[in-house]
């Protein structure tokens, strides 16, 4: 509540100074702070000299605004003193604006710029935490930052200088481009006691902002957070590597966290999730290599996967690992069955069914115990932490001629489920959650389920 009151008082003081400029435009350049002691009475001069020492000591601690006038019942002297006081503060204000490299138009149009930003839907929150005591490392007297050498300056003028610096930083950073705002910060407030943090992070600037924010949290106590919520600027806050890994889900909205550490943690979690998804997709991709028809259908459904392969070197390594595992999955069942054509169809269907269950039913209950250790190795490569044992291909419900008749329906349904799961994981990957789908085998409802998934696939491509 106290910072809000101080902020309102500072705005009123600035408006009063602007009114004084409009009335007396040419008298501010010739006045010096030493003219305050030239009062007609000795009592007033002694009081002001004592007030100067008090103001010097309080400039290092908390800010305060004091208007103390021990003047006799002479209205002319009192009005003269107040005018000199305001003109001196205005003189220091113009010097501070020249030192910052900004034009005086920023100060005059400050209220107009705030209204313009509010009309665009930008929300600003300014939190000022200031504690008493000596200034920390990097904290200086605000009047000394502006290049003012004479001592004995009023606390109200120091506070107005600080507020003007704060608003010049905040508004120029929001109204002008990023390069202009960075130039203004380097000239004026690189060592000031205020740290401005905004969430309009550009991709080539994010590492520097992160480093500066961690240093400022350790060195400063006066923190001013100016946050701007805008959907287009939030989407540009992604790293280039993060955009490459999540380009397939570019329609997702990534909510920027309050803490940069939490944001980096979510990046690593999403990265690991996408690596697991790529393991599963590559393992399922190459397990269907024994049929040219399945390769054609799979190539239709994995155009997005090929983009991810061209953008990252991790995907090519995953493809090599998954290729070795999937070839073993196809050749080992075909060697154990001792029947040439019919056995190859059964082994292909069983391996594809196991791949589907390993990819979807990671936490499903499967009571069948596999006699091949290569399936558990592939399942560890896909999921990383799951402990599911794949079912035995000999116990699968495809035998004899039924396997020949149902192979086309099962592969079509598996392909539909594969594309459905890939799109679902791309959409929900930013939230850090895994979609777990347990699918039971029913011979009567195979065609109905495949048709239903084909109907559900269409909204995912939009």
UniProtKB/Swiss-Prot annotation:
Modified residues (Pyrrolidone carboxylic acid): 24
Stretches the record annotates as Disordered: 24-61, 131-157, 173-194, 270-432
InterPro entries linked to this entry: Semenogelin
GO biological process: antibacterial humoral response; antimicrobial humoral immune response mediated by antimicrobial peptide; coagulation; insemination; killing of cells of another organism; negative regulation of calcium ion import; negative regulation of flagellated sperm motility; positive regulation of serine-type endopeptidase activity
Cellular compartment(s): Secreted
Role description: Predominant protein in semen. It participates in the formation of a gel matrix entrapping the accessory gland secretions and ejaculated spermatozoa. Fragments of semenogelin and/or fragments of the related proteins may contribute to the activation of progressive sperm movements as the gel-forming proteins are fragmented by KLK3/PSA. Alpha-inhibin-92 and alpha-inhibin-31, derived from the proteolytic degradation of semenogelin, inhibit the secretion of pituitary follicle-stimulating hormone.
Listed PANTHER family: SEMENOGELIN-1, SEMENOGELIN/SEMINAL VESICLE SECRETORY PROTEIN
Subunit and interaction comment: Occurs in disulfide-linked complexes which may also contain two less abundant 71- and 76-kDa semenogelin-related polypeptides. Interacts with EPPIN (via C-terminus); Cys-239 is a critical amino acid for both binding to EPPIN.
Record protein name field: Semenogelin-1
Organism whose genome encodes this protein: Homo sapiens (Human)
């Amino acid at each position: 509540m106290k910072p809000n009151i101080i902020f309102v008082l500072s705005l009123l003081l600035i408006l009063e100074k602007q009114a004084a400029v409009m009335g007396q435009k040419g008298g501010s350049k010739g006045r010096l702070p030493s003219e305050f002691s030239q009062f007609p009475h000795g009592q007033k001069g002694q009081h002001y000299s004592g007030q100067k020492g008090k103001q010097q000591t309080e400039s290092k601690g908390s800010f305060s605004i004091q208007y103390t006038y021990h003047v006799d019942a002479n209205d002319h002297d009192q009005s003269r003193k107040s005018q000199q006081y305001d003109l001196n503060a205005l003189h220091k204000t113009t010097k501070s604006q020249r030192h910052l490299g900004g034009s005086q138009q920023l100060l005059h149009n400050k209220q107009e710029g705030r209204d313009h930003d509010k009309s665009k839907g930008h929300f600003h929150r300014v939190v000022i935490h200031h504690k008493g005591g000596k200034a920390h490392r990097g904290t200086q007297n605000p009047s000394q930052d502006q290049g003012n050498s004479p001592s004995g300056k009023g606390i109200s003028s120091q506070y107005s200088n600080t507020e003007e610096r704060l608003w010049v930083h905040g508004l120029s950073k929001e109204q002008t481009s990023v390069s202009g705002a960075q130039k203004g910060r380097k000239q004026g407030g690189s060592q000031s006691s205020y740290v401005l943090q905004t969430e309009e992070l550009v991709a080539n600037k994010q590492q520097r902002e992160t480093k500066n924010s961690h240093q400022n949290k350790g060195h400063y106590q006066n923190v001013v957070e100016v946050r701007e919520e805008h959907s287009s600027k939030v989407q540009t806050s992604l790293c280039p590597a993060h955009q490459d890994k999540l380009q397939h889900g570019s329609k997702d909205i990534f909510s920027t966290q309050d803490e940069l550490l939490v944001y980096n943690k979510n990046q690593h979690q999403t990265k690991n999730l996408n690596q697991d998804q790529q393991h599963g997709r590559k393992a399922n991709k190459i397990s269907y290599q024994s049929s040219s028809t399945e390769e054609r259908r799979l190539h239709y459904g994995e155009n997005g996967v090929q983009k991810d392969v061209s953008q990252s070197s991790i995907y090519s390594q995953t493809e090599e690992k998954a290729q070795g595992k999937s070839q073993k999955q196809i050749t080992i069942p075909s060697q154990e069955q001792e029947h040439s054509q019919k056995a190859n169809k059964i082994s292909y269907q069983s391996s594809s069914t196991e791949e589907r269950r390993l990819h979807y039913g990671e936490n499903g209950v499967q009571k069948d115990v596999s006699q091949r250790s290569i399936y558990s190795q592939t399942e560890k490569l896909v999921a990383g932490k799951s402990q599911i044992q794949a079912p035995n291909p000999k116990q699968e419900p495809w035998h004899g001629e039924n396997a020949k008749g149902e192979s086309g329906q099962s592969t079509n349904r598996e392909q539909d489920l594969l594309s459905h799961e890939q799109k679902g994981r791309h959409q929900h990957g930013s939230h850090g959650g895994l979609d777990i789908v347990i699918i039971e085998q029913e011979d009567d409802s195979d065609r109905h389920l495949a048709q239903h998934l084909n109907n559900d696939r269409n909204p995912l491509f939009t």
